[in-house]
Amino acid sequence: MRPYKAIDIPDFPLIQSQLLELLDQTITDFSYTNTKATTYELVKDKCPRLIEFLDANDLVWDVGRFFVTPPRDGLYIHVDGNSERSRIFSLNLPLLNCEQSEMIWWDNVEVVEYRSHESYGNNIAKMDSENKIQIASLALTTPHLVRVDIPHSVENNQDNLRAIFSMRFKPEPYHLWY
Protein backbone atom coordinates (compact mmCIF):
# COMPACT_ATOMS: atom_id res chain seq x y z
CA MET A 1 0.00 0.00 0.00
CA ARG A 2 1.30 3.45 -0.89
CA PRO A 3 1.93 5.87 1.98
CA TYR A 4 -0.08 8.60 0.25
CA LYS A 5 -3.52 9.14 -1.24
CA ALA A 6 -4.71 11.90 -3.57
CA ILE A 7 -7.54 13.98 -2.13
CA ASP A 8 -9.89 15.96 -4.37
CA ILE A 9 -10.50 19.42 -2.93
CA PRO A 10 -13.06 21.52 -4.83
CA ASP A 11 -11.81 24.94 -5.92
CA PHE A 12 -8.25 24.00 -5.01
CA PRO A 13 -6.63 26.63 -7.32
CA LEU A 14 -8.53 29.34 -5.42
CA ILE A 15 -7.54 27.85 -2.05
CA GLN A 16 -3.94 27.59 -3.25
CA SER A 17 -3.79 31.28 -4.21
CA GLN A 18 -5.34 32.32 -0.89
CA LEU A 19 -2.84 30.21 1.04
CA LEU A 20 0.04 31.72 -0.97
CA GLU A 21 -1.10 35.19 0.12
CA LEU A 22 -1.21 33.96 3.70
CA LEU A 23 2.26 32.41 3.33
CA ASP A 24 3.71 35.79 2.37
CA GLN A 25 2.18 37.28 5.52
CA THR A 26 3.38 34.42 7.74
CA ILE A 27 6.97 33.56 6.80
CA THR A 28 9.44 36.36 6.23
CA ASP A 29 12.74 34.46 5.91
CA PHE A 30 12.90 31.96 3.06
CA SER A 31 16.65 31.32 3.26
CA TYR A 32 16.45 28.12 5.34
CA THR A 33 14.07 25.19 5.86
CA ASN A 34 11.38 27.00 7.75
CA THR A 35 7.93 26.35 9.15
CA LYS A 36 5.32 28.46 10.82
CA ALA A 37 1.99 27.51 12.35
CA THR A 38 -1.07 29.51 11.51
CA THR A 39 -4.34 29.72 13.37
CA TYR A 40 -7.69 28.27 12.44
CA GLU A 41 -9.24 31.74 12.72
CA LEU A 42 -6.79 33.25 10.25
CA VAL A 43 -7.31 30.45 7.72
CA LYS A 44 -11.08 30.66 8.23
CA ASP A 45 -10.92 34.37 7.46
CA LYS A 46 -8.55 34.15 4.47
CA CYS A 47 -9.47 30.72 3.02
CA PRO A 48 -13.16 30.03 3.69
CA ARG A 49 -13.38 27.40 0.90
CA LEU A 50 -10.72 25.33 2.65
CA ILE A 51 -12.69 25.46 5.90
CA GLU A 52 -15.84 24.43 3.98
CA PHE A 53 -13.94 21.39 2.69
CA LEU A 54 -12.78 20.49 6.21
CA ASP A 55 -16.30 20.85 7.61
CA ALA A 56 -17.88 18.84 4.77
CA ASN A 57 -15.43 16.00 5.47
CA ASP A 58 -15.71 16.04 9.28
CA LEU A 59 -12.09 17.11 9.68
CA VAL A 60 -11.39 18.75 13.03
CA TRP A 61 -8.44 21.16 12.78
CA ASP A 62 -5.55 20.47 15.13
CA VAL A 63 -2.72 22.41 13.50
CA GLY A 64 -1.92 23.95 10.13
CA ARG A 65 1.64 24.81 9.13
CA PHE A 66 3.48 26.26 6.20
CA PHE A 67 6.66 24.38 5.29
CA VAL A 68 9.24 26.11 3.13
CA THR A 69 12.25 24.29 1.70
CA PRO A 70 14.95 26.40 0.01
CA PRO A 71 16.53 25.37 -3.29
CA ARG A 72 18.83 22.32 -3.10
CA ASP A 73 17.83 21.63 0.51
CA GLY A 74 15.67 19.16 2.38
CA LEU A 75 14.53 17.68 5.65
CA TYR A 76 16.21 14.59 7.13
CA ILE A 77 14.49 11.24 7.63
CA HIS A 78 12.02 11.39 10.54
CA VAL A 79 8.57 10.42 11.77
CA ASP A 80 6.13 12.91 13.25
CA GLY A 81 5.28 12.57 16.91
CA ASN A 82 7.07 11.08 19.88
CA SER A 83 7.28 7.87 21.91
CA GLU A 84 3.94 8.64 23.59
CA ARG A 85 1.91 9.88 20.64
CA SER A 86 2.68 9.53 16.98
CA ARG A 87 0.94 11.35 14.21
CA ILE A 88 -0.50 9.14 11.49
CA PHE A 89 -1.70 11.45 8.71
CA SER A 90 -1.09 14.88 7.31
CA LEU A 91 -3.09 16.59 4.60
CA ASN A 92 -0.44 18.28 2.46
CA LEU A 93 -1.34 20.98 -0.05
CA PRO A 94 1.20 22.04 -2.69
CA LEU A 95 1.67 25.79 -2.93
CA LEU A 96 4.84 26.60 -4.83
CA ASN A 97 7.39 24.67 -6.95
CA CYS A 98 6.49 21.19 -5.75
CA GLU A 99 6.81 19.50 -9.15
CA GLN A 100 10.56 18.86 -8.93
CA SER A 101 10.78 18.04 -5.25
CA GLU A 102 9.96 14.81 -3.48
CA MET A 103 8.57 13.47 -0.27
CA ILE A 104 10.29 10.10 0.18
CA TRP A 105 9.33 7.22 2.48
CA TRP A 106 11.90 4.80 3.88
CA ASP A 107 12.20 1.36 5.43
CA ASN A 108 14.98 -0.28 7.45
CA VAL A 109 15.57 2.77 9.66
CA GLU A 110 15.38 3.01 13.45
CA VAL A 111 14.69 5.85 15.86
CA VAL A 112 17.90 7.53 17.05
CA GLU A 113 16.23 10.09 19.30
CA TYR A 114 12.97 11.91 19.89
CA ARG A 115 13.22 15.66 19.67
CA SER A 116 10.89 18.49 20.44
CA HIS A 117 11.29 20.79 17.46
CA GLU A 118 9.64 24.14 18.01
CA SER A 119 10.79 25.23 14.56
CA TYR A 120 9.08 22.24 12.92
CA GLY A 121 6.02 22.57 15.09
CA ASN A 122 5.90 19.17 16.73
CA ASN A 123 7.91 16.35 18.17
CA ILE A 124 9.81 14.32 15.63
CA ALA A 125 11.90 11.19 15.81
CA LYS A 126 15.23 11.43 14.04
CA MET A 127 16.09 8.17 12.31
CA ASP A 128 19.29 6.19 11.75
CA SER A 129 19.49 6.11 7.96
CA GLU A 130 22.68 4.13 7.38
CA ASN A 131 20.83 1.09 5.95
CA LYS A 132 17.81 2.91 4.54
CA ILE A 133 15.69 1.49 1.73
CA GLN A 134 13.43 3.78 -0.28
CA ILE A 135 9.87 2.41 -0.46
CA ALA A 136 7.97 5.27 -2.14
CA SER A 137 8.24 8.85 -3.32
CA LEU A 138 5.82 11.57 -4.34
CA ALA A 139 6.11 14.87 -6.14
CA LEU A 140 3.30 16.72 -4.37
CA THR A 141 1.49 18.36 -7.30
CA THR A 142 -2.05 17.92 -5.95
CA PRO A 143 -3.47 17.65 -2.41
CA HIS A 144 -2.56 14.37 -0.72
CA LEU A 145 -3.19 12.66 2.57
CA VAL A 146 0.23 11.33 3.55
CA ARG A 147 1.45 8.92 6.21
CA VAL A 148 3.78 10.72 8.62
CA ASP A 149 4.17 7.76 10.98
CA ILE A 150 6.32 6.05 8.34
CA PRO A 151 9.90 7.36 8.16
CA HIS A 152 10.01 10.08 5.51
CA SER A 153 12.12 12.95 4.25
CA VAL A 154 11.87 15.84 1.81
CA GLU A 155 14.30 16.64 -0.99
CA ASN A 156 14.10 19.83 -3.00
CA ASN A 157 16.61 19.21 -5.80
CA GLN A 158 15.82 22.29 -7.84
CA ASP A 159 16.83 25.92 -8.02
CA ASN A 160 13.49 27.16 -6.67
CA LEU A 161 11.98 27.44 -3.22
CA ARG A 162 9.31 24.80 -2.38
CA ALA A 163 6.29 25.62 -0.20
CA ILE A 164 3.41 23.50 1.09
CA PHE A 165 0.62 23.85 3.64
CA SER A 166 0.30 20.86 5.98
CA MET A 167 -2.68 20.15 8.25
CA ARG A 168 -3.15 17.73 11.15
CA PHE A 169 -6.48 16.71 12.61
CA LYS A 170 -8.01 15.33 15.82
CA PRO A 171 -9.08 12.63 15.50
CA GLU A 172 -6.89 11.25 12.72
CA PRO A 173 -8.80 11.22 9.38
CA TYR A 174 -8.95 7.45 8.82
CA HIS A 175 -12.25 7.92 6.97
CA LEU A 176 -10.40 9.71 4.14
CA TRP A 177 -7.84 6.93 3.88
CA TYR A 178 -10.10 3.87 3.63
How would you describe each model-predicted region?
Residues 1-47, 159, 167, 171-178:
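N-terminal auxiliary "cap/dimerization" subdomain that precedes the catalytic jelly-roll/cupin core
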Residues 8, 68, 94, 145-147, ...:
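Short, well-ordered beta-strand micro-motif
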Residues 44-57:
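N-terminal leader segment of winged-helix/HTH proteins
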Residues 55-73:
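A short glycine-rich, His/Asp/Glu-containing loop-to-beta-strand
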Residues 56-59, 96-101, 157, 172-174:
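Secondary-structure boundary elements
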Residues 62, 87-89, 99, 161-165:
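Residues that flank catalytic or metal-binding motifs in active/ligand-binding sites
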Residues 69-143:
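Catalytic core of non-heme Fe(II) oxygenases with the double-stranded beta-helix
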Residues 116-178:
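Catalytic core of Fe(II)/2-oxoglutarate
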